Structure formats: C-alpha cells, structure tokens
Amino acid sequence: MKVLGIDPGTATTGYGLIRSEAGRVKAITYGTIVTPAQLEMPLRLYQIYRELQALLMEYKPDAVAVEEIFYNRNSKTVITVAQSRGVILMTAAAAGIPVAEYTPLQVKQAVVGYGAAEKKQVQLMVQKILGLQQLPRPDDAADALAVAICHLHSYRLSSFLESSATKAGEKR
C-alpha cells in the first residue's frame, strides 16, 4: 500500500509518500511545495493544486492522508491553511483517491505513542520507522511522513478489526 501524507500550508505544504510491503515501511519520496509570498492567493492555491496533481499522477498512491488544522490564535493563518486543505482534498477527490484526515494528536499518538510529543521526538520516530539515515527535512516533509505513517497504522488496525469481526461472525 502506498500512502501520500500531506501537511497543508499556503507558503509550504509538506508531502511524504511511503510504501508498506511485507510488514516493512519505506519512504519513496518526500519534500515540500513552496509558493512565493508575492503571488496572489488564488495563484498560490493553483500552484499547490498543480504540484499535488503531478505527484498523484506520478506515484499513484492508494490513499492520501491529510493533517487537520490545529487551533491557532491567528485566524488569518487558520483561514489560509483551510484554503490549502480545500485544494488538497479536492485534488485527491478529483483523482479518485480516498482521503483520510488526522489531528496532530492522532499523528503523535500513532508515531510516538504520546499525544503531547515534541516535534523532535516525532521526527526521530519517523526516521527510525522508515529506516532513514538522517532526520527527514524540512519539518513540513517530516510532518507529512508522520501523517502517512499514522494512516498506515490506522488502516492496518481497521483491517485487522474487520478481519477479526468477520472471523467471529463465521464461528457463530
């Protein structure tokens, strides 16, 4: 299974593509989509759309996992991140790829096992889980890889629970 994790933003959107095969998880690619601050918002959003669409066409992930917006006192930041999330969700939907959304708390719990983990702890666990030689950089890409790992854990758990429920139903 291939999962594309996304850490949304207007200035910088992180992405991280992972693959799970035979119980092993590997990073395929990761990086950022950076939009110039001098561009008007519609053009920045269009750039995110174009670059994400190219990633989806090239790598054909089985799922896209997007981090939800966390509370921020700056309402302008929340609005611009929400706009980029809308573009991301629409781009994945248009490509026919299932989308899952996770809170930062869920991501930290899935990757580190502790919902109040520090950013550095998350990065170290992402490095360890994916067997990377160095910490994934930049931070937005590391966060996106963590979101993808979170989805993979969630998918495995739900598949296991479905399988267990089916087997329990067959025994009746």
Swiss-Prot record:
Q: Which GO terms describe its biological process?
A: DNA recombination; DNA repair
Pfam families recorded: RuvC
Task: Give the matching InterPro entries.
Answer: RNaseH-like_sf (IPR012337), RNaseH_sf (IPR036397), X-over_junc_endoDNase_Mg_BS (IPR020563), X-over_junc_endoDNase_RuvC (IPR002176)
Q: Which residues form the active site?
A: D7, E67, D140
Subcellular localization, per the record? Cytoplasm
What this protein needs as a cofactor is: Mg(2+)
EC number annotated for this UniProt entry:
3.1.21.10
- The enzyme's first-digit EC class, named in words, is hydrolase
Task: Note whether Nucleotide-binding occurs among the keywords.
Answer: no
Function of this protein?
Answer: The RuvA-RuvB-RuvC complex processes Holliday junction (HJ) DNA during genetic recombination and DNA repair. Endonuclease that resolves HJ intermediates. Cleaves cruciform DNA by making single-stranded nicks across the HJ at symmetrical positions within the homologous arms, yielding a 5'-phosphate and a 3'-hydroxyl group; requires a central core of homology in the junction. The consensus cleavage sequence is 5'-(A/T)TT(C/G)-3'. Cleavage occurs on the 3'-side of the TT dinucleotide at the point of strand exchange.
User: Which HAMAP family does the UniProt entry name for this protein?
Assistant: RuvC (MF_00034)
Q: How does it assemble?
A: Homodimer which binds Holliday junction (HJ) DNA. The HJ becomes 2-fold symmetrical on binding to RuvC with unstacked arms; it has a different conformation from HJ DNA in complex with RuvA. In the full resolvosome a probable DNA-RuvA(4)-RuvB(12)-RuvC(2) complex forms which resolves the HJ.
Q: Which PANTHER family match?
A: CROSSOVER JUNCTION ENDODEOXYRIBONUCLEASE RUVC
Q: What is this protein called?
A: Crossover junction endodeoxyribonuclease RuvC
Q: Write the gene name.
A: ruvC
